[in-house]
């Protein structure tokens, strides 16, 4: 009976120790979330089919380091004008970038926005930028009626 009394007396301390260890392990497992290398949102604003359309590409990253990115558009039919412009910018965690293109077409067109992570000096502050090992080209496609 005496040994049973000692077992019940030590139990709350052991339970508290196990609880603390479990909470510590759970917290360590939560810190292993993966960051999004690049998030892209492509919007096409068009009032009427005979008028000019504006293509807006918003690019953001969850990385702590900055990257030099080059953004451009591709299409299934040739389009003239500033559609062919390429934008180079520094993409950092707290500063998403928005790129704008104006285009005019009379038919349905599939537009692909491409963002390349490149190595170029003089774009990011103090030339501090990273290049991902896994992937350096990202794209998103939409149709413009």
Swiss-Prot record:
Glycans are attached at residue 106. GO terms for biological process: proteolysis; regulation of immune system process. GO terms for cellular component: extracellular space. Its main location: secreted. GO terms for molecular function: aspartic-type endopeptidase activity. Pfam families: SVA. Keywords: Disulfide bond, Glycoprotein, Pyrrolidone carboxylic acid, Secreted, Signal. Coiled coil: none annotated. It is found in: Secreted. Residues 1-28 form the signal peptide. Disulfide bonds join 66-92, 90-124. The modification Pyrrolidone carboxylic acid is found at residue 29. PANTHER family: PROLACTIN-INDUCIBLE PROTEIN, PROLACTIN-INDUCIBLE PROTEIN/SEMINAL VESICLE ANTIGEN. Belongs to the PIP family. Monomer. Interacts with AZGP1. This is Prolactin-inducible protein homolog. It comes from Bos taurus. The lineage of its organism: Eukaryota, Metazoa, Chordata, Craniata, Vertebrata.
């Amino acid at each position: 009976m005496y040994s049973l009394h000692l077992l019940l007396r030590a139990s709350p301390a052991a339970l508290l120790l196990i609880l603390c260890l479990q909470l510590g392990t759970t917290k360590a497992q939560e810190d292993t979330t993966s960051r999004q290398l690049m998030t892209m949102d492509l919007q096409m604003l068009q009032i009427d089919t005979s008028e000019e359309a504006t293509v807006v590409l918003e690019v953001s990253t969850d990385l702590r380091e900055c990257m030099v990115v080059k953004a451009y558009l591709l299409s299934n039919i040739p389009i003239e004008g500033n559609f062919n412009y390429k934008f180079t910018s520094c993409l950092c965690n707290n500063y998403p970038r928005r790129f704008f293109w104006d285009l005019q077409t009379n038919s349905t067109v599939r537009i692909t926005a491409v963002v390349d992570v490149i190595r170029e000096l003089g774009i990011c502050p103090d030339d501090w930028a990273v290049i991902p090992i896994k992937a350096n080209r990202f794209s998103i496609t939409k149709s413009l009626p």
